């Protein structure tokens, strides 16, 4: 289940936008603290891109 909480990020076009990720997951090596990654869709170009999510974002 995807949690749709909007976060403020920078799009590949260089603009700041407040978007909700379509998918979110944790990326971590064995035995280490990982980072949270979100899959976003650029509203201007329609292309998908990945961006780091805040640590307090529920996955």
UniProtKB/Swiss-Prot annotation:
| Family stated for the protein in its record | Belongs to the Cren7 family.
Superkingdom of the organism of origin: Archaea
Q: Which species does the entry assign this protein to?
A: Metallosphaera sedula (strain ATCC 51363 / DSM 5348 / JCM 9185 / NBRC 15509 / TH2)
- Disulfide-bonded cysteine pairs: these are none
Q: Quaternary form? A: Monomer.
Q: How is it modified after translation?
A: Methylated at multiple sites, to varying extents.
Q: Which UniProt keywords apply?
A: Chromosome, Cytoplasm, DNA-binding, Methylation
Under InterPro entries, the record lists: Cren7_sf, dsDNA-bd_Cren7
Task: Give me the Gene Ontology terms describing cellular component.
Answer: chromosome; cytoplasm
Q: Where in the cell is it found?
A: Chromosome; Cytoplasm
Gene Ontology molecular function terms on file: double-stranded DNA binding
Q: What is this protein called?
A: Chromatin protein Cren7
* Role, per record: A chromatin protein, binds double-stranded DNA without sequence specificity. Constrains negative DNA supercoils.
